[in-house]
Amino acid sequence: MQTPAPVEYSRATSVDDVIEKLVSLDGKARILAGGHSLIPMMKLRLANPGHLIDINPLESELSYVREEGDEIRIGAMTRHKDLLDSELLQRVFPNIFEEAEWVLADPVVRNRGTIGGSLCQADPAEDLSGVITALHGKAVVKGPDGERVVDMHEFHLGPYMTVVQGTEMVTEVRFEKGPGQHGSAHEKVERRAGDFAIVAASAALWLEGGSIARVGLACSAVGPTTIQMTRAEEMMVGKEPSDELFAEAGKISTEDCEPGSDGRGPADYKRAVAGVLSKRALIRAWTRARGETLPRHSHWHPQA
């Protein structure tokens, strides 16, 4: 079956209008942004909303990348191509968004897909969730009772499940800029260019006085959600960076991930790759934090 079930459609005029519509429809509506995940699921009858609320008219309200005090804020309707082209993101968080966006699907998806849509789709193998988790990002969720701010490591409940209720929507993603010298990187193993990850790792660190003042490490496609490697992060904070330290962090990643065997590979393989990519991403982030320039990573395809 490649035809969606009958569905009602309306265009939103504001965020408040979206919330009102969601409430009036008793949470049975779905929000339509880029549509590259939702529409295929509707065609396969894996998603059968009774009503679609199109938020594309809200780009002027929800599409932005801006700096506010010690935070970077990204509107939920900001498209992947705009994240890739953002000079502000390249200045504050150089490389990590670029490396993730270049391997996210293809230009058609990047031109239409949005950061909010990617997060709410909650695919465990999705690239941006790892980036946002490594940067210790937070999602702003708005509903009839007001706004709440959710840490990214608490945002996803399982595959295709989030904390966002049927009468709520994501409006923004926020990041603290962090102290000292910063470096970050995104590593990915995929079957072919633009595919979902077999395994991916995102790392970000901040150096002060030669030691790690803050660090984020996340792995995707090795569990029911993107996994923040909290134990590895805590082990690294306050220590001087080194290849040996990052090798230990990679070992912890292999222990703390929860991969399953599927068409992309056996669990033991994914576990080993998570450790290798974690170490590699941390070393590249450290190199960049020292001010050295590295080219955008050429991601590895097993069949090559």
Name each model-derived stretch.
Residues 1-304:
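C-terminal structural segment of proteins
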